[in-house]
């Protein structure tokens, strides 16, 4: 849509599709702006209400991201911006008492740093790798700003028989997210 020496803006247009009846409603425009020498990406989602105000009501509106991940499960991280900093988790958290994972490995992981574990030459690394095989894999996260003064973050494992569990509540989330793995972050 716009291209210059300092920024570029991409414009995507489409229509939401109702899951209930495949009805096409709410035309939308998404603009992504990328800036020179900046890690910031602006994301603007605009929708046009084209329904019948007497029978069509909005329960919620959201944006869903799917990101293919690479590398070890314990090196996959997600971070949401919150009103008091950030909510950060690993897809596989190496907090285990049996087998006991070395505290320095867990501390490195919780700082969002990549772990380079060599099971052949390091017993602590071998223990962490073995423990990771028995940990839940938190692969689905939801950030929901459900009112002007409340948001929640929930997480879930892949198993369809399992429900989401609460991760965090707060007042306002800026809507920022960082998803990282061994190949980089988004």
What are the residue ranges of the model-derived segments?
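Beta-strand/loop-rich accessory regions of lumenal/periplasmic or secreted enzymes
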Residues: 1-186
């Amino acid at each position: 849509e716009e291209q210059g020496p300092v920024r570029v803006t991409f414009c995507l247009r489409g229509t939401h599709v109702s899951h209930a009846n495949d009805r096409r409603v709410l035309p939308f425009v998404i603009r992504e702006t990328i800036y020179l020498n900046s890690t910031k990406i602006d994301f603007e989602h605009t929708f046009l209400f084209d329904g019948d105000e007497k029978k069509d009501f909005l329960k919620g509106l959201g944006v869903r991201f799917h990101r293919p991940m690479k590398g070890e499960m314990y090196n996959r991280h997600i971070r949401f911006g919150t009103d008091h900093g950030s909510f950060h988790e690993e897809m596989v958290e190496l907090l285990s008492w049996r087998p006991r994972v070395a505290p320095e490995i867990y501390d490195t992981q919780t700082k969002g740093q990549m772990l380079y574990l060599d099971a052949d030459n390091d017993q602590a690394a071998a223990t962490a790798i073995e423990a990771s095989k028995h940990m839940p894999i938190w692969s689905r996260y939801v950030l929901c700003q459900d009112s002007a003064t409340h948001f929640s973050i929930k997480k879930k494992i892949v198993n369809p028989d399992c429900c989401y569990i609460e991760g965090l509540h707060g007042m306002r989330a800026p809507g920022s997210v960082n998803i990282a793995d061994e190949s980089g972050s988004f």
